[in-house]
């Protein structure tokens, strides 16, 4: 028994699998929460990086490029340890779950920023010229002309990164977060049966990946690709 759960270890593998399912589902909820929060942070921070990286002012664009490269070239676990162990030394303390989600978001923001930048650069330059001829300010041109056409182009890539974030959530177990894989390990440690819980986690991840990929394809097919009319 652990965390209020009891496991049936004496009536066969099926009974054991059914008895551990509630704890794995609790781990699944934690996994999804961390993944979606991390994805949200990555999308927002990635857009900030993309805008800064695309500026013509070198003293803004170059530091942004260096920071993006630094984030991409350092391991997720190193960034996680920095947030969890180093920041508290300076009085900056976050709960373990939030720390994990932030680490995921920061790591993937560097990749997503390049996805955004590619989508923005793919928009026909004539769209910018047309907005300029209408005397639209740069900020409104970006939010009303460029982004509505750039975002639909990058939906498939964003979906792929969401799936990748889900599969990276188990790294957060090093800061005591009991996500799905860590829950399976705990069950295995207590029952000496690792095959069943780990196999179940693998199956759940497979289902998650298939469902997420299908949803991304549906959104990509049904999302308008030509943006929205100017107002």
Swiss-Prot record:
One example of a Gene Ontology biological process annotation: amino acid transport
Superkingdom per UniProt: Bacteria
Keywords, ordered alphabetically: Amino-acid transport, Cell inner membrane, Cell membrane, Membrane, Plasmid, Transmembrane, Transmembrane helix, Transport
Transmembrane parts of this sequence: 9-29, 32-52, 64-84, 86-106, 161-181, 196-216
Membrane topology of the entry: Multi-pass membrane protein
SUPFAM superfamilies membership: MetI-like
GO CC, any one term: ATP-binding cassette (ABC) transporter complex
Compartments where located: Cell inner membrane
CDD domains: TM_PBP2
Major location category of this protein: membrane
Gene Ontology MF, one: transmembrane transporter activity
ABC transmembrane type-1 domain residues: 28-217
PANTHER family the UniProt entry points to: L-CYSTINE TRANSPORT SYSTEM PERMEASE PROTEIN TCYL, MEMBRANE COMPONENT OF AMINO ACID ABC TRANSPORTER
Stated family: Belongs to the binding-protein-dependent transport system permease family. HisMQ subfamily.
Annotated function: Probably part of the binding-protein-dependent transport system y4tEFGH for an amino acid. Probably responsible for the translocation of the substrate across the membrane.
NCBIfam families from the UniProt entry: ectoine_ehuD, HEQRo_perm_3TM
Protein name, as recorded: Probable amino-acid ABC transporter permease protein y4tG
Lineage: Bacteria, Pseudomonadati, Pseudomonadota, Alphaproteobacteria, Hyphomicrobiales
């Amino acid at each position: 028994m652990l965390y209020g759960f009891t496991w049936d270890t004496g009536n066969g593998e099926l009974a054991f699998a059914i008895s551990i399912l509630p704890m794995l589902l609790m781990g699944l909820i934690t996994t999804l929460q961390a993944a979606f929060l991390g994805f949200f942070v990555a999308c927002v921070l990635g857009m900030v990086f993309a805008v800064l990286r695309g500026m013509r002012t070198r003293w803004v664009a170059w530091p942004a490029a260096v920071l993006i490269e630094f984030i991409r070239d350092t391991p997720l676990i190193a960034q996680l340890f920095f947030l969890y162990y180093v920041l508290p030394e300076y009085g900056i303390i976050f709960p373990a779950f939030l720390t994990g989600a932030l680490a995921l978001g920061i790591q993937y923001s560097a990749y997503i920023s390049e996805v955004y930048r590619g989508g923005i650069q793919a928009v026909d330059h004539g769209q910018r010229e047309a907005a300029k001829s209408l005397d639209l300010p740069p900020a409104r041109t970006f939010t009303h002309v460029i982004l509505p056409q750039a975002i639909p182009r990058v939906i498939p890539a964003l979906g792929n990164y969401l799936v990748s974030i889900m599969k990276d959530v188990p790294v957060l177990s090093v800061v005591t977060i009991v996500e799905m894989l860590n829950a399976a390990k705990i069950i295995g440690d207590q029952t000496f049966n690792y095959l069943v819980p780990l196999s179940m986690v693998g199956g759940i991840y497979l289902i998650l990946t298939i469902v997420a990929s299908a949803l991304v394809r549906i959104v990509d097919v049904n999302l308008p690709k030509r943006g929205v009319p100017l107002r």
